[in-house]
Amino acid sequence: MKMLLLLCLGLTLVCVHAEEASSTGRNFNVEKINGEWHTIILASDKREKIEDNGNFRLFLEQIHVLENSLVLKFHTVRDEECSELSMVADKTEKAGEYSVTYDGFNTFTIPKTDYDNFLMAHLINEKDGETFQLMGLYGREPDLSSDIKERFAQLCEKHGILRENIIDLSNANRCLQARE
């Protein structure tokens, strides 16, 4: 009986783990990230980039998947006014990597997603010979569980981003009223 319970537990853990994907992995299905998203947390090794009025304090509204690119629709807040910003990210030659020009040259991957609830993105920006990295946690709903937020914080730490540079935006003005 104990063996049967252990087998069931093991199979359950395998099934739960199998539902997560990475854009650099073989099991990644880009079509499944299509649709509405909300910015939950931003993190960066240059915190000023994601603070109020920072150029990378962007609130994701939608990802539209095309054949070799992604159309990303964001909102940004400047002087308490919401503005819409759209950009096209093109596939690069590296598996699961996309590039976009915005305040420099950016490449990004999606290290983790379960498609239905959350998406974690890792971006590297290069501008004027300097680089910084940014990570974002996005949800299908306006907020996510503390467990997912903690997993994101641990992923940030693995990329060298300190916890004090992680900003939870779930209670910030994310221009939710500007969504169509």
Swiss-Prot record:
One of its GO terms (biological process) is energy reserve metabolic process. It is found in: Secreted. GO terms for cellular component: cytosol; extracellular space; nucleus. Abundant in the urine of adult male mice but absent from that of females. GO terms for molecular function: insulin receptor activity; pheromone activity; pheromone binding; small molecule binding. CDD domains: lipocalin_MUP-like. Residues 1-18 form the signal peptide. Disulfide bonds join C82-C175. Keywords: Disulfide bond, Pheromone-binding, Secreted, Signal, Transport. The keyword Disulfide bond applies. Pfam families: Lipocalin. Coiled coil: none annotated. Binds pheromones that are released from drying urine of males. These pheromones affect the sexual behavior of females. Belongs to the calycin superfamily. Lipocalin family. This is Major urinary protein 1. It comes from Mus musculus (Mouse). The lineage of its organism: Eukaryota, Metazoa, Chordata, Craniata, Vertebrata. The gene is Mup1.
